[in-house]
Amino acid sequence: MKNVTHSFVFLAHWPSAGSFGLNTNILATNLINLTVVVGVLIFFGKGVLKDLLDNRKQRILSTIRNSEELRRGTIEKLEKARIRLQKVELEADEYRMNGYSDIEREKANLINATSISLEQLEKSKNETLYFEKQRAMNQVRQRVFQQAVQGALGTLNSCLNTELHFRTIRANIGILGSMEWKR
């Protein structure tokens, strides 16, 4: 580019040889000078302008490619984040449901344990009442038996005299003696 600029400067200071020369005063230029200047500008400027436009185009395309890659990467990250969010929500729902089911299970277990304890207490109470009733009945039986024995002894003592007593003893000894010989 520096060479192109020096060429224009060189042409501008070129001494005119007669009829052809480069007039740098734009207002005093003629059509030929303008055509030459425009032609030189197009010839040399076309490459420079094309290089500038190509560089700009490459930068724009590169920026677009980078933006597309970033967009794809962002979309992938967003999809991964959505999938992860869904997994976390499912796990949270599962933990919540498991927590509720654990609470319900513990509640049912507690109710069952309490019910079993109440049944055992009721059974123990009934057994205790039964044993107390049996003990009271046994005590009554013992008293009745003792009173009956005492009454019978009293009756026997009052009815038996000494001779009747001796006769009963001899009869019992005779019965026992005959039982012994039979064996």
From Swiss-Prot:
Q: Which GO terms describe its molecular function?
A: proton-transporting ATP synthase activity, rotational mechanism
A single GO cellular-component term from the record reads:
proton-transporting ATP synthase complex
Q: State where the protein is found.
A: Plastid, Chloroplast thylakoid membrane
What keywords are annotated for this sequence in UniProt?
Answer: ATP synthesis, CF(0), Chloroplast, Hydrogen ion transport, Ion transport, Membrane, Plastid, Thylakoid, Transmembrane, Transmembrane helix, Transport
What InterPro entries does this protein map onto? ATP_synth_b/b'su_bac/chlpt (IPR002146)
Its membrane topology, per UniProt?
Answer: Single-pass membrane protein
Tell whether Transmembrane is among the UniProt keywords. Answer: yes
Transmembrane residue ranges: 27-49
Pfam families for the chain: ATP-synt_B (PF00430)
- Note the subunit structure: F-type ATPases have 2 components, F(1) - the catalytic core - and F(0) - the membrane proton channel. F(1) has five subunits: alpha(3), beta(3), gamma(1), delta(1), epsilon(1). F(0) has four main subunits: a(1), b(1), b'(1) and c(10-14). The alpha and beta chains form an alternating ring which encloses part of the gamma chain. F(1) is attached to F(0) by a central stalk formed by the gamma and epsilon chains, while a peripheral stalk is formed by the delta, b and b' chains.
Q: What exactly does this protein do?
A: F(1)F(0) ATP synthase produces ATP from ADP in the presence of a proton or sodium gradient. F-type ATPases consist of two structural domains, F(1) containing the extramembraneous catalytic core and F(0) containing the membrane proton channel, linked together by a central stalk and a peripheral stalk. During catalysis, ATP synthesis in the catalytic domain of F(1) is coupled via a rotary mechanism of the central stalk subunits to proton translocation. Component of the F(0) channel, it forms part of the peripheral stalk, linking F(1) to F(0).
Family per similarity comment: Belongs to the ATPase B chain family.
What miscellaneous comment appears in this entry? In plastids the F-type ATPase is also known as CF(1)CF(0).
Q: What is this protein called?
A: ATP synthase subunit b, chloroplastic
Q: What is the lineage of its organism?
A: Eukaryota, Viridiplantae, Streptophyta, Embryophyta, Tracheophyta
Q: Which gene encodes it?
A: atpF
